Amino acid sequence: MDAAGLAEQITELLQLCRLLWIAIEHRDGWAAFAHWIVILLHCRARKEFFVAEPIPFRCNFMTRKVYLAGPEVFLPNAREILDRKAALAREAGLLPLSPGDLEIPHTNSKRERAAAINAVDEKMMIQADAIIANLTPFRGIAADTGTAFELGFMCASGKPVFAYTNVARDHSGRVSDLYGGAVAYDAEGRLRDPNGIAVEDFGLADNLMLHAGIERRGGVLIIGDAARDALYTDLAAFKTCLAVAVEKLR
């Protein structure tokens, strides 16, 4: 074993000792201790998952990790917006985990790269304690499909879920706008589009599986109303959602 390897093992041993002490000193600390042991072992095997944000031994032991989901990764200034959101999360006392933060392993094809990105993002969601999802309509009248998947992933994982949107008009209203207002109620009181296809009409921000799924789990979906040219850069609704998440995660 070379000097670098020995130093790494000594560092890990010291980290484990510190975690053990904290587990003894804090009520309910053993579950968290076991959680960090798993992450530490995972880090040894797959260090690329911790390139941008190492395991947070420097942070408060009980710091909550929040996965920041949203379509911002596609923006031309993605790094700027993601960094702003991450900074706000840190200021609020949370540890942000965000797609685009971490190094993607080298691959030999586009299909393999897609799978690698999916794997990295799912690993971060597994490590996260909660999610804040940006459900602002993206390339259409509904939330980004990748963000919807991530929200469902966290719901299925039994973790706290929070979300926001920068569009105040509800889902059925946006469907109506899509068809130039040509939606109408049928004889049974069901709202339908010009093709006779039913339209969800619950006054929700998006598909009921998203909005109702969040609220059923005790989360919130903050409704913002940003200017059209700032739909993905206005962080007012995000800040409100972040404040609620911090309070509920205490």
Language-model segments: which ranges?
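Short linear/disordered segments characteristic of secreted peptide precursors
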Residues: 8, 26-31, 44-46
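Aromatic (phenylalanine/tyrosine) cluster motif
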Residues: 33, 49-50, 57, 61
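Conserved catalytic or regulatory cores that recognize and/or transform ribose-phosphate-containing ligands
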Residues: 56-250
